[in-house]
Every structure is written in structure tokens, then in C-alpha cells.
Amino acid sequence: DRSRGLGDVYKRQRMPGGRVTKEKLKFLVDSIERYDVKRAHITTCQTVQFHDLDAKAVCDIMEQAMDAGIVTRGGGGDFPRNTMVSPLSGVEQGEYFDVLPYAEEAGDYLMGIIKTVKLPRKLKVGFSNSPANVTHATFRDLGFVAKEEGTFDVYSAGGLGNNYRMGVKVAENVKPEEVLYYVEAMVRTFTTYGNYESRAKSRTRYMQETLGVDGYRKAYQEKLAEVKAEYKDSLLIKLEGKVAENAINNMGNNSADDVEGKNTADMSENITESITKNVADNIVKTDENVVLETAESYPQKEAASERILPQKQQGLYAVAYHPIGGIVPVKKFGEIYNIIKDIEDAEVRIAPDET
């Protein structure tokens, strides 16, 4: 949250991995209506911001968000930030495996230290599910990069700001269930060797300067050994139920080139044709109350085939919507909710490019 004056406050809602369930989306829709939110922004860290709020609205939203499973604490300042994930993890064709469940566990763990650990500066953690590396996990304070065999390479002390640095590879072939040991090791390395005196040099990447690359790697690995000795098996992630089943089934499931006997390119073309047939006077309608797009409200000339993305689950698709500058017309939240509310397992994912 930041304020430049009375009535000029914004509230950032964490969405770990950019995942917005229908329940969370409904909360956003209701809050927009209840507090007359005029401006909303989806961010490069995969969160949702409400702008131009008064003090009462900010406090009310903070409290009510908890009931919807949304945490607002630590959205800014020297805290662990929203955990980033490849936006279509779990449904993306060609991904190595679904990293989202492990990222959500990491995010929950980091939220647990907010009240007890004082970091030198903010800490950004990212997970990548494929070589596309949409989250730039190799350039984060801590990044987990998926590998084809179902493990992670771990990068640390990277950053894309001033004096940008690629992260130091501190571990290879890490089992997904062990990621919390690496998260805790990062926290301890940062609090031990990070700069509390100069904010200009307080980000993790400056530890590469003070310790040297090899020195930093050694320092991190020493903390990792310390964490493993202290916690033993207690930090192992144990996924349960449907989440565990999906994670296992998704590993190595890269082939979805043929959907129910039809080439995905042909399927995309057919869907595009179907949408085109429903266009009347440049308006696409889903029901009598909801208008998805008009030429005036969404001026980009983008082919529908570029926005319809075949999932690796046969016969299912994702639809991309990219608001200019990440500024979403506030009514769009309600329109999207009305479209997906009755679709089983449908949800919204926010991408690092503000799609």
C-alpha cells in the first residue's frame, strides 16, 4: 500500500502463483461494487491492486479478504512478496510438470515468517515449469526451475533491477517435496549476509558482490545443511488428495498434439470460426447482460487463434485476455466471473506480463 495523500491509497491483494479461484474472483467483484472501486491493476508479480481507496475501504478490504483466502499483509515493504509461477502451470502443453502446488506451499511458508523475521529488503521467489521461464526464475532472489525428469534446479541472489544479476545456481536436481528447505536456507542466508545499512544495496543480488559468486554459493549451501540438520523430515511437502494425484499425473505428460483425433491447430481454427460467427456489430455476447468486447473498448487487432490456448488436457482450452498496461476495466471482473462461475474447475490465472 502506498499513499501520496488523502484518498490516494492502493491495496494489493496477494494471489500466490497468480491463481484467482472463482471464490477469490467473486470477492474482488463484490469489493469493487461495495467500495465503488474505479481503478484496478494486475501486476507483473501476479497480484491484483485496487487504486484510489479511502482509509475505511482499505481497512475493510484487508479484514474481509481473509475470509476469502486472500492475504494483503506484506504486499509491499521488506517482506516476502507474492510467489510467482508460470501462469498456466498444470494445464500448459509441453511443461515439465505442475509446479503450482509446490509454489503455493512455499508462499504459505513465507507468510508464516512475516511476523518473526526482519529481512534486509523484499524477497521475491519464482517457479518456472518449462524452458520458457516466463517468471524469470533464474533472475529472482530465489528461483526454482523445473527439469524434464521432475526435479528443480535452484537459483539464488538474482535480480532484474539496478545492477541486475543472474542468480547463482546453488543446487541441482532438487526433489519438489524438498523446496521448503531451500526457502528457509534463503531466508537465513539473506538475514545473515544481507545489507541492513544501505537500502541501495540491500537486495539479495548484492551478496554476490560482497561474498563473490563462489563465496555466496558456499554460504547458501552451509545454511542449507544447517536447515536440513535442524528440521530433518519436518519440512517435506506432502501433497494430498486431488492435488497430489494431479501433480503426479502431470509429470512428463507433455504430449497433447492431438485432441480427440483433431490437430490442435485445426481445433483453434474451428473455435476462431465459431467465435467469428457469433460476432454482430463488433460485439461478442455471452448472454443478454454481458458484453465481452467491442472494437471501442478493446482496440487491439489480435487474432482469436493467438488468444485461445489448447491445454494438455484433451478438449480443454484457456483464453488469454491482455489489458493494456495491466489496467483492467473494473466491470471486466464481473463479466469474467459471470462467464466462469458455472464452469467446473475454471479459474483465472494472472501472468507476469499482466495478461
Region roles according to the model:
Residues 119-213, 217:
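Mobile "lid/hinge" segments at catalytic clefts and subdomain interfaces of large enzymes
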Residues 1-6, 10:
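Single conserved hydrophobic/aromatic residue that forms the stacking wall/gate
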Residues 4, 37-42, 192-197, 308-313, ...:
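Short, flexible, solvent-exposed loop/turn segments with mixed acidic/basic and small polar residues
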Residues 7, 83-85, 160-167, 195-202, ...:
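Short acidic (Asp/Glu) and glycine-rich catalytic loops that position anionic groups and cofactors
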Residues 111-115, 187, 191-195, 225-228, ...:
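Hydrophobic/aromatic-lined pockets within catalytic cores
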Residues 11-152, 181, 250-258, 262-269, ...:
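Small-residue-enriched alpha-helical segments and adjacent helix-cap loops
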Residues 279-296, 300-317, 324-347:
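Long hydrophobic segments that form regular secondary structure
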Residues 52, 56-57, 64-68, 191-262, ...:
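Terminal amphipathic helices with adjacent charged low-complexity linkers/tails
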